[in-house]
Amino acid sequence: MASATEDPVLERYFKGHKAAITSLDLSPNGKQLATASWDTFLMLWNFKPHARAYRYVGHKDVVTSVQFSPHGNLLASASRDRTVRLWIPDKRGKFSEFKAHTAPVRSVDFSADGQFLATASEDKSIKVWSMYRQRFLYSLYRHTHWVRCAKFSPDGRLIVSCSEDKTIKIWDTTNKQCVNNFSDSVGFANFVDFNPSGTCIASAGSDQTVKVWDVRVNKLLQHYQVHSGGVNCISFHPSGNYLITASSDGTLKILDLLEGRLIYTLQGHTGPVFTVSFSKGGELFASGGADTQVLLWRTNFDELHCKGLTKRNLKRLHFDSPPHLLDIYPRTPHPHEEKVETVEINPKLEVIDLQISTPPVMDILSFDSTTTTETSGRTLPDKGEEACGYFLNPSLMSPECLPTTTKKKTEDMSDLPCESQRSIPLAVTDALEHIMEQLNVLTQTVSILEQRLTLTEDKLKDCLENQQKLFSAVQQKS
């Protein structure tokens, strides 16, 4: 067992959201943290001492997912308002908006090269978008219920998705077809992702399980049941050797995938934990949940061994490199129960410099002629029962989520800038939005016509060439 100096430690915590944290992501350079919340806001936290935090105002409903682009120059967010927004992560808050789906959008994910964005929605579809042209490319339809998550493989050749239809599907991005399907008769996966080498996927189950699958041989490799509540999120360490899980039982757990066992149980949140993510280098990880707190942890464990493994896995991200055959996981499926010889860490939520943990917040309103937001008068849903009901199967809720639990009311929103402060009347913005939608449809129609015209010209050219060859042959015979 690791010594105390190698155990994870709580480094900082942040408070600024007024409702449950739904998603978070650390920037590629490790200097910023983006968080999404049930309060409809996106927040950007800077790790520099005394730096100001930014609160992005614009989404009309719960922000369900957030992710930095691979270069850190863009921030994508998904919302129950059926849109996806791309933000520039600075104080200007400039953004572009996709009218992405016909139902709430549950997840966003950039490809490793940053050229594509995958979105998953409750309209049962996955959509892929071009970031270069900022336009829709294609849809993937095979799920029969809400799609909760969709992730690119490290080489961009595959997409994995999970749905409330109790299936996990693997999609080929070249032919846009479903090439593999994993099903479960008990529960559905809340979250799914590829390991850094792209050879395996892991799923976070509503049935309290974590499963690891080999996508090359289509077999279940590992099965963990270490939580007492639904598992909401997972994150692979960049080395691929560790997996961290977030659960409605209020804990984070760290699994050693090489040895196939639980090594740490982290208790810091009060209530369900909805999201967790390692930094790109693996030295940090962050977590968020129903208590509205964002906790930043320092990893510490296996620090010496991870650097070489991380470099080896990063090399596999090249598009010409197939998955490495030296898989790190056991070859036969076997279940794992929680073991006694694990380390339990329950930090006191106290940081020496509280001012750093709760920095001043700058509200950034989104002004853009291509999008509109609702007027003031929004009320926040309760951060306990309703948030949990959205993320979890009601039958699998932890006691903190049940209606009988005493719930604290959310804070008043009157101190935040509201949309009614805009000088543009709502009727005008509605008209502008309608015009922009029609222009988008017109642009897509023109693009399709251009493609058809190109095909027609190519066919006509072939006909003329064949005709010329035929005339030449006739003249030679005569």
Curated annotation (Swiss-Prot):
Repeat (WD) residue spans along the chain: 16-55, 58-99, 101-139, 142-181, 183-223, 226-265, 268-307
Modified residues (Phosphoserine): S321
Effect of R106P: In CORD20; disrupts interaction with FAM161A; localization of the mutant is cytosolic without enrichment at specific subcellular sites
InterPro entries assigned: G-protein_beta_WD-40_rep, WD40/YVTN_repeat-like_dom_sf, WD40_repeat_CS, WD40_repeat_dom_sf, WD40_rpt, WDR55_POC1
GO annotation, cellular component aspect: centriole; centrosome; ciliary basal body; cytoplasm; spindle pole
Gene Ontology BP terms: acrosome assembly; cell morphogenesis; cell population proliferation; centriole replication; cilium assembly; homeostasis of number of cells; positive regulation of centriole elongation; retina homeostasis
Cross-referenced CDD domains: WD40
Subcellular location: Cytoplasm, Cytoskeleton, Microtubule organizing center, Centrosome; Cytoplasm, Cytoskeleton, Microtubule organizing center, Centrosome, Centriole; Cytoplasm, Cytoskeleton, Cilium basal body; Cytoplasm, Cytoskeleton, Spindle pole
Signal peptide segment: none
Keyword flag Metal-binding: no
Post-translational modification, as annotated: Phosphorylated in mitotic cells that may be mediated by CDK1.
Record key words, sorted: Cell projection, Cilium biogenesis/degradation, Coiled coil, Cone-rod dystrophy, Cytoplasm, Cytoskeleton, Disease variant, Phosphoprotein, Repeat, WD repeat
PROSITE patterns named among the record's database cross-references: WD_REPEATS_1, WD_REPEATS_2, WD_REPEATS_REGION
Pfam families in UniProt: WD40 (PF00400)
Function of the protein: Plays an important role in centriole assembly and/or stability and ciliogenesis. Involved in early steps of centriole duplication, as well as in the later steps of centriole length control. Acts in concert with POC1A to ensure centriole integrity and proper mitotic spindle formation. Required for primary cilia formation, ciliary length and also cell proliferation. Required for retinal integrity. Acts as a positive regulator of centriole elongation.
Involvement in disease: Cone-rod dystrophy 20: A form of cone-rod dystrophy, an inherited retinal dystrophy characterized by retinal pigment deposits visible on fundus examination, predominantly in the macular region, and initial loss of cone photoreceptors followed by rod degeneration. This leads to decreased visual acuity and sensitivity in the central visual field, followed by loss of peripheral vision. Severe loss of vision occurs earlier than in retinitis pigmentosa, due to cone photoreceptors degenerating at a higher rate than rod photoreceptors.
Entry similarity comment: Belongs to the WD repeat POC1 family.
Subunit structure: Interacts with POC1A. Interacts with FAM161A. Interacts with CEP44; the interaction is direct and recruits POC1B to centriolar microtubules. Forms a microtubule-associated complex with POC5, CETN2 and FAM161A. Interacts with CCDC15.
UniProt name for this protein: POC1 centriolar protein homolog B
